Amino acid sequence: MSQQLAKEISQRAAKAARAVATLSETDKNAVLQKMADAIRARQDKIIEVNKKDLATGKEKGLSDAMMDRLELTPERVEGMASAIEEIIALKDPVGDSYVLDERPNGMKIEKMRIPLGVICMIYEARPNVTADAGALCFKSGNAVILRCGREAIESSKAIAEALHEALEASNLPKDVITVVPTPDRELMTELLQQKDYIDLVIPRGGEGLIHFVSDTSKIPVIQHYKGVCHLYVDKDADLDKALAILLNGKTQRTGVCNALEGLLVHQDVADKFLPMAAKALAEKDVTIHADKRSVSYFDGADEIADDAFGEEYLALEIAVRTVDNYEGAIEHIQEFGSGHTEVIITENDETAKRFIREVDSAVTMANVSSRFSDGGQLGLGAEIGISTSKLHAYGPMGLEALTTEKFVVTGNGQVRD
């Protein structure tokens, strides 16, 4: 049953992809505006359905971070609609071309951006991904299969109804955006075998989900891996600036992948900065896990071993370590970072440039909060995820990351000798 359903869903999506691949930017934008309008019109219904998911999640004991991701408020529903309108304002990359070469025989060689085809998005308690991914894939000329976790299934279906309303009003097949009707693991496994119809899989979620999808899929996978993001306070840091960025990165919103999970402090400024951090983090009720060189600065902190870092807390918790020097910070990040986002605070331009050049992560920042590691904040509009895979996309994935390039060769009757 699951095998047949997975094949049917994938086949319908592949057929629908052909319908959207050739739409003009003007036509796609008109449909997207209808999607935004439909989400606004259905706000009350979406929130009502979401309350059922929240009640179920509470009964099942979901973590505070998961519940935060799951919850839809009027502001968040409006945010989904606004994100679609931001996508409308973005230039459509499909059809863009550039000349590579003109051969001696007169052939013209170009490369042109084209849609990927069918994208399968697998995610957990993030109903907003339904709207974001649906709109991004549509604008980039792709069909999308959305498989959300059981935590958000009803909310995602309600959002999909709004998107389908816009598609049907535009005489387009609903299969352009498909929400898998059940979170059944067997069905997901079968979807990951549909290499004849699905072109790319993007998982967003916990470590277990990412590993399962990567190990099971016969289709190329771009991972949205966990966010173990670090803040390194250099010996030449502005400490007031560092404190503000620490608090923003750790406490503004904890259950997101661009929140800070690790604090590294150069030993030359530890005596001054760590007491500042201890006071400010205590006021925000942040639990501290610190190495033996740092633990005494914090009341009630627990000491952790040197090999116990690298945890994605997604809560008011942070790991703290004092490092000997810049090289010590880099070594720590290389060992315990997840390749998501890393931040340095320093007034030394050469050190900042070196950090940006040497740190191996999808996003590297100097003197700004990790919370800006987000497609919308970086000018991409809504993002489909933050890739930690070094494939054609690395970092926040906007429209262009959902396309590929093909060669276009034009001539005037040339034949090969």
Curated annotation (Swiss-Prot):
**Which reaction is catalysed here?**
L-glutamate 5-semialdehyde + phosphate + NADP(+) = L-glutamyl 5-phosphate + NADPH + H(+)
What's its EC?
1.2.1.41
Q: Which Gene3D superfamilies match?
A: Aldehyde Dehydrogenase, Chain A, domain 1, Aldehyde Dehydrogenase, Chain A, domain 2
Q: In which pathway does it act?
A: Amino-acid biosynthesis; L-proline biosynthesis; L-glutamate 5-semialdehyde from L-glutamate: step 2/2
Q: Which Pfam families match?
A: Aldedh (PF00171)
Does the UniProt entry include the keyword Glycoprotein? no
Role noted for this protein: Catalyzes the NADPH-dependent reduction of L-glutamate 5-phosphate into L-glutamate 5-semialdehyde and phosphate. The product spontaneously undergoes cyclization to form 1-pyrroline-5-carboxylate.
- Its recorded name reads Gamma-glutamyl phosphate reductase
Q: Which organism is it from?
A: Idiomarina loihiensis (strain ATCC BAA-735 / DSM 15497 / L2-TR)
From which lineage does this chain's organism come?
Answer: Bacteria, Pseudomonadati, Pseudomonadota, Gammaproteobacteria, Alteromonadales
